[in-house]
Amino acid sequence: MSGQKYQLVSLLLIICLLFSQSTASGCNFKGSCRTDDQCKRICRGHGLDPSFQLCVPYSSKGGKCCCLHYEGAPLSSEVI
């Protein structure tokens, strides 16, 4: 029984480590904003598809909007 617990814990740890790795290529800081909706409009305005984005008002950068584009996600100008 003890061996099964270690196997289960090991499996859960591996799963958590695999799925917690970010595939984001980094922030593209665009414009200034105070809300998530403003940030989404800014990301859209720069040709980045918000369905593949994480738009975050980033206050420590002077209210800049972080348009986070994931690797492999097409830009809105690209044909899928």
Swiss-Prot record:
Keywords for this protein: Antimicrobial, Disulfide bond, Fungicide, Plant defense, Secreted, Signal
Any one biological process term the GO annotation gives: defense response to fungus
Cystine connections: 27-67, 33-55, 39-65, 43-66
Membrane spanning residue stretches: none
GO annotation, cellular component aspect: extracellular region
Location of the protein in the cell: Secreted
Pfam entry (one): AtDEF-like
Matching InterPro entries: DEFL
Signal peptide span: 1-24
Primary location recorded for the protein, binned into one broad class: secreted
Domain of life: Eukaryota
Cited PANTHER family: DEFENSIN-LIKE PROTEIN 270, DEFENSIN-LIKE PROTEIN 270-RELATED
Recorded family membership: Belongs to the DEFL family.
Protein name: Defensin-like protein 276
